Amino acid sequence: MNTSAPPAVSPNITVLAPGKGPWQVAFIGITTGLLSLATVTGNLLVLISFKVNTELKTVNNYFLLSLACADLIIGTFSMNLYTTYLLMGHWALGTLACDLWLALDYVASNASVMNLLLISFDRYFSVTRPLSYRAKRTPRRAALMIGLAWLVSFVLWAPAILFWQYLVGERTVLAGQCYIQFLSQPIITFGTAMAAFYLPVTVMCTLYWRIYRETESRARELAALQGSETPGKGGGSSSSSERSQPGAEGSPGTPPGRCCRCCRAPRLLQAYSWKEEEEEDEGSMESLTSSEGEEPGSEVVIKMPMVDPEAQAPTKQPPRSSPNTVKRPTKKGRDRAGKGQKPRGKEQLAKRKTFSLVKEKKAARTLSAILLAFILTWTPYNIMVLVSTFCKDCVPETLWELGYWLCYVNSTINPMCYALCNKAFRDTFRLLLLCRWDKRRWRKIPKRPGSVHRTPSRQC
């Protein structure tokens, strides 16, 4: 889990002081047991929520799912085995179990760090390179990156922990103790601390600062865009209507089933899918296909249902309309043509940027909470690692124990960060804990055009 041997198994401490009092043992056992239970419960809620709530199945949440898996391993195995070791005062499960525990602990903990790096890089590229990165940001690619993170963690720690004694020809770990053999050298301990904690933290903090600056820049651009619009104007027809250029009229001889010339004019705006934005959980920045320099037309073309030409009586078509369209000049169109009203494309662009900015800020809040929890819980132990490298007896045994357990507490805090910063996680957790989740009793209620909002139709 960390870059050095645990406090009770540190090479700086020959043996864990035995003979803890019964009240002390009871307090440690109850406290650590509750922490383990909270860790397992919280991360199981994350996994179950991802399974039952389709709104949570986004690319960004795939990384949170992987982080929850690592935290679940720590809560299930690492916490309980270390508590047993701490209370007994010696390792009583044999050398094989010791090596397997250390390998599992360090692989899962390093995978947590790798997943935090993935989340940070994912947010950074989503904000700074929205067009090029979003095209490559697929669930399959996210799964590949997560698999590589776990593979790298396994390759870095598991073989060295399990087979180091065979490489050097002997096992130097003292009987009754359990720690990583090759970390008994101070210089190696110092190097692993820098590579496994300080370097990743530096990278993550740098990326978060860049994300923060870019998000603030987006907010200023959005404020300027909204400020340039004229209040109370820019309202247009519904999404089922199209605007044509002034003077663009259909040909009297346009046959049924064909659209007039004004219908074939380039559309000012591309249809926008709110559903896609909802599911992705962060706003994308695909550019609109409209040309902001164009002005909307002064006529509204309303498409009417087609009529079978064979069933129609042979009548002469009116000279100013096609069989399937009706054009009507609008006052707004004349006002826009006369006053140079801003195109509706800017309103749509502002709405998209607003929605995008909200999603980006929500994802940034989740990242900041996870990153802050990681730094606060892992820093004390890793500071002690550096201190013990230069002064073996300067760190008390109790501080080693507290620092090591504090690293484990990070796995308990992470699910709370998801719930505090993400309403979808929070609502799903609440429904699961209250036993009110039943997919068959959920109905779809439209929130926006093209999106659905799931809400319980009745309680169970």
Curated annotation (Swiss-Prot):
Topology of the protein relative to the lipid bilayer: Multi-pass membrane protein
- Recite the UniProt keywords alphabetically: Cell membrane, Disulfide bond, G-protein coupled receptor, Glycoprotein, Membrane, Phosphoprotein, Postsynaptic cell membrane, Receptor, Synapse, Transducer, Transmembrane, Transmembrane helix
One GO CC term on file:
dendrite
UniProt biased composition (Basic residues):
328-343
Transmembrane residue ranges: 23-48, 63-84, 96-121, 143-164, 186-209, 367-390, 398-420
Q: Which InterPro entries match?
A: GPCR_Rhodpsn (IPR000276), GPCR_Rhodpsn_7TM (IPR017452), Musac_Ach_M1_rcpt (IPR002228), Musac_Ach_rcpt (IPR000995)
Disulphide bridges, residue numbers: C98-C178
Residue spans, topological domain Cytoplasmic: 49-62, 122-142, 210-366, 421-460
Task: List, alphabetically, the CDD domains matched.
Answer: 7tmA_mAChR_M1
Bias kind Low complexity: ranges: 238-247
Name of the molecule in the record: Muscarinic acetylcholine receptor M1
Species per Swiss-Prot/TrEMBL record: Pongo abelii
Gene name in the database record: CHRM1
